[in-house]
Amino acid sequence: MSEKKVERVLTGTVVSNNRNKTIAVLIERKVRHPIYKKYIKRSTKVHAHDEKNKCALGDLVRVVEAKPFSKTKHWALLEVVEKSVFVD
């Protein structure tokens, strides 16, 4: 009875890449208010493992749930969906 575990995949924006092989990804979702029925933005920040340090600030990335890399890092970079364009 080997059941395949379903992996969670999230899409978000890189908000920090200051640490070596680690990125912080902001995941935004919309939830409906139970009383007022208005959609509200909610966000979660997760830390993900970036083995090759290829992410930059503002990149749209896809992360997948993985084994714990450290105390707060439980996600791994799956792919860079869209590179950001920053103009100084």
Swiss-Prot record:
- Taxonomic superkingdom: Bacteria
Entry function: One of the primary rRNA binding proteins, it binds specifically to the 5'-end of 16S ribosomal RNA.
Q: Name one Pfam family in it.
A: Ribosomal_S17
What the record says about family reads: Belongs to the universal ribosomal protein uS17 family.
State any single GO MF term.
structural constituent of ribosome
| Protein name (database record) | Small ribosomal subunit protein uS17
A Gene Ontology biological process annotation? translation
**Source species, please?**
Ruthia magnifica subsp. Calyptogena magnifica
Q: Which NCBIfam families does the annotation name? A: PRK05610.1, uS17_bact
UniProt gene name? rpsQ
SUPFAM superfamilies per UniProt: Nucleic acid-binding proteins (SSF50249)
Q: What keywords were assigned to this record?
A: Ribonucleoprotein, Ribosomal protein, RNA-binding, rRNA-binding
- The signal peptide here is none
Q: How does it assemble?
A: Part of the 30S ribosomal subunit.
- Give a GO cellular-component term: cytosolic small ribosomal subunit
